[in-house]
Amino acid sequence: MKTTIILILLTHWVYSQNPTSGNNTATLCLGHHAVANGTLVKTITDDQIEVTNATELVQSTSIGKICNNPYRVLDGRNCTLIDAMLGDPHCDVFQYENWDLFIERSSAFSNCYPYDIPDYASLRSIVASSGTLEFTAEGFTWTGVTQNGRSGACRRGSADSFFSRLNWLTKSGNSYPTLNVTMPNNNNFDKLYIWGIHHPSTNNEQTKLYVQELGRVTVSTKRSQQTIIPNIGSRPGVRGQSGRISIYWTIVKPGDILMINSNGNLVAPRGYFKMRTGKSSIMRSDAPIDTCVSECITPNGSIPNDKPFQNVNKVTYGKCPKYIKQNTLKLATGMRNVPEKQIRGIFGAIAGFIENGWEGMVDGWYGFRYQNSEGTGQAADLKSTQAAIDQINGKLNRVIERTNEKFHQIEKEFSEVEGRIQDLEKYVEDTKIDLWSYNAELLVALENQHTIDLTDAEMNKLFEKTRRQLRENAEDMGNGCFKIYHKCDNACIGSIRNGTYDHYIYRDEALNNRFQIKGVELKSGYKDWILWISFAISCFLICVVLLGFIMWACQKGNIRCNICI
């Protein structure tokens, strides 16, 4: 009886051991790289899926300063572009300046006779895109009037002065004759003329300066005509002046003629600005300008353009990422992450990719782990790794190429009377941003889905390649591992990895070992049940033996049993 019990317990222990730990078998598992803490990305089918690595696609911060390279950035300091163009005394340093981007500061102010420009935004945009304040004086003949009017509101140094690009005409003696002046454009470029009309604060000031009780200014070309009549009346005082000057502008094409007719209140041009076509622009910003390199500028400062999208500012200049609403979009640049289970059981069994990934595999994305007579080991499969990396590399650059703007997004400005146009423009811009935000999210989700499917496919391809090599010499264990039924040392494992494994060499040995092991080994589907039954029978037999011993001892008188009621 004792012998039977010992044999049953021994058999139970033997069945509990790892059947692949012998010298005549080996275990080969295929797996992929994993990390302890992956990155969540969005795909077409999942809002959140964990991958081993991902790249942020949205630039959400600027460097806090505007780089002056590779663009010529002109700091307007205390001057607006229009004041610099008109020749405000405190902006004389900007005469004949050139720029790619003119930076207007919030601290900019006018320091001359108070003026308004009915179409300020258009004039500002035209001058900004020209990229220069190059000015050419012309010999206008103003007969019978006094030129070079001045004002105490516009001082140049300690003397009264006026805008350097404009000529304020007043009466000569007690007369102001009707003026008729023409100026042809015989050049092959457009000319921009700036002129204006003075609005006195009182009728007395009107006759004192221009004799006539009501003046008039008409400026014409072959294509256009503007007639302006002064609005006489008191206005809030600015730098001691309650009068105003309204500034207008006229573009004269090659072969056209500029005609000026006036009987009073004319602020005449002194020459023209040469119009240029280019990609120069203007931007309002208080960010400091520094010596650095950046191809994208926003009012918040320059930003890198190595990402396809940005959430810093809608207004940009240069080669910039596309503006979207999202603060973050992550592009998967690694495979699906399945963190490795830290506890593998009593015998430290290895597991394949079906169960989890492998942490610590730094030399490749896909690889092998094995157990054989020489111990355990791990090696990466560089071919499948490179195949996946080659297809993922360049993905970010392709997204950038599709989305980076090669032009600047200018500020949209409209006068108060164009409120409906401004509302429409805002609606169009917001709609464009909404569409781009949606397209960006969809594009990234598609790319992420493709990356994950691609890396999964490479894993399956490697598994199928290994299975075709091993054939009947091994059995698929269902967890990404193969049980090899012949002795397979490290050299043998290496031949499987590099594709030189010859299954015919090991075929006979594998078949013999398979039959021998199958005679003892139990299929995993029934093994647990048999082990539990064996354990139950063992316990039952122990109880029977113990009960028989007690009964035998009672009969011999070695044990006395008293039952008390």
UniProtKB/Swiss-Prot annotation:
User: According to its UniProt record, where is this protein mainly located?
Assistant: virion
Q: What family classification does the UniProt entry report for this protein?
A: Belongs to the influenza viruses hemagglutinin family.
Functionally, this protein is described as follows:
Binds to sialic acid-containing receptors on the cell surface, bringing about the attachment of the virus particle to the cell. This attachment induces virion internalization of about two third of the virus particles through clathrin-dependent endocytosis and about one third through a clathrin- and caveolin-independent pathway. Plays a major role in the determination of host range restriction and virulence. Class I viral fusion protein. Binds to sialic acid-containing receptors on the cell surface, bringing about the attachment of the virus particle to the cell. This attachment induces virion internalization either through clathrin-dependent endocytosis or through clathrin- and caveolin-independent pathway. Plays a major role in the determination of host range restriction and virulence. Class I viral fusion protein. Responsible for penetration of the virus into the cell cytoplasm by mediating the fusion of the membrane of the endocytosed virus particle with the endosomal membrane.
Lipid attachment in record (S-palmitoyl cysteine) = 554, 561, 564
User: Extra notes?
Assistant: Major glycoprotein, comprises over 80% of the envelope proteins present in virus particle. The extent of infection into host organism is determined by HA. Influenza viruses bud from the apical surface of polarized epithelial cells (e.g. bronchial epithelial cells) into lumen of lungs and are therefore usually pneumotropic. The reason is that HA is cleaved by tryptase clara which is restricted to lungs. However, HAs of H5 and H7 pantropic avian viruses subtypes can be cleaved by furin and subtilisin-type enzymes, allowing the virus to grow in other organs than lungs.
Share an example GO biological-process annotation for this protein: virion attachment to host cell
Compartments in which it is found = Virion membrane; Host apical cell membrane
Q: Which residues lie on this side of the membrane: Extracellular?
A: 17-529
Query: Per its record, how is this protein called by name?
Result: Hemagglutinin
Modifications after synthesis and translation: Palmitoylated. In natural infection, inactive HA is matured into HA1 and HA2 outside the cell by one or more trypsin-like, arginine-specific endoprotease secreted by the bronchial epithelial cells. One identified protease that may be involved in this process is secreted in lungs by club cells.
TM region(s), chain numbering: 530-550
Q: Which cysteines share a disulfide bond?
A: 29-481, 67-292, 79-91, 112-154, 296-320, 488-492
Assembly and interaction partners: Homotrimer of disulfide-linked HA1-HA2.
Residue intervals annotated with topology Cytoplasmic:
551-565
Q: Which residues form a coiled coil?
A: none
Q: Which InterPro entries match?
A: Capsid_hemagglutn, Hemagglutn_HA1_a/b_dom_sf, Hemagglutn_influenz_A, Hemagglutn_influenz_A/B
